[in-house]
């Protein structure tokens, strides 16, 4: 059995986990930075300072709760990209320091791969499988062929889906993060009232574009007095629009996989936006594949997914040198 201590500091969550190859989570400590909610978005400098302030305490707490010592660990893993460079440096340097002192292997984890693979901690999802990664910083389709081996089928040409949710929420006067509030208000709204543009729909390929939807919402806000019901109807119409786009793109992704002679049975939808229950249900109803969603706490950023990905990479003997530099931009294809 292998056991890993993992660190996640790529954005505004400071998290530490201890995970083993028997699929047991021995400890998980996470601190979300409330400061960014007051400011309407993540401030990179504030985020990195908070990581420096809290990370060592979370590591100490996780080790104590696991009833292990550093000598009991088989490796130390950290999210080393992509993400905000300040946070990546804090987490990666701390993990490398522990690895050096404890004389344990260091594993640099790609944040995107961690989102893609965490489902295998919970379910018997076998390679190859289709991945839709929808989060605050990323929106892309991938075929996961194996650990460290991916084919990107498409991605956003402008904003990520999470950014679109947050920016639309801000236009409507809602607080950050906007996704949960849009989902809540949409339940009271009429999703057919406003016809928002479905960019890229009915076109070949798997790319996305969400800038036109934002512009359409901005125009609605300027035209209407935006009563409480108007806000609810915009939220509902926005979610309907997004679900139509995702369904269209998924169909194309399946076709692209077939054209590559890759048989896909399992479809994993992950990332922060995958916690949206409306989108989950729409995709479940219309996609004829085995669909898997991580639980909500594993859709958003966490260290459990980093630890499990560390386990998967350790089992392949994918070890990284202690001079590995964090990468704010890191394509999963080149992993």
From Swiss-Prot:
Enzyme class: transferase
Family matches, as Gene3D superfamilies: 3.30.420.40
Keywords: Acyltransferase, Cytoplasm, Iron, Metal-binding, Transferase, tRNA processing
InterPro entries named in the record: ATPase_NBD (IPR043129), Gcp-like_dom (IPR000905), KAE1/TsaD (IPR017861), TsaD (IPR022450)
Biological role: Required for the formation of a threonylcarbamoyl group on adenosine at position 37 (t(6)A37) in tRNAs that read codons beginning with adenine. Is involved in the transfer of the threonylcarbamoyl moiety of threonylcarbamoyl-AMP (TC-AMP) to the N6 group of A37, together with TsaE and TsaB. TsaD likely plays a direct catalytic role in this reaction.
MF (Gene Ontology): iron ion binding; N(6)-L-threonylcarbamoyladenine synthase activity
Comment on bound cofactor: Binds 1 Fe(2+) ion per subunit.
Species whose genome carries this gene: Wolbachia pipientis wMel
GO cellular component, as recorded: cytoplasm
Protein's name in the database: tRNA N6-adenosine threonylcarbamoyltransferase
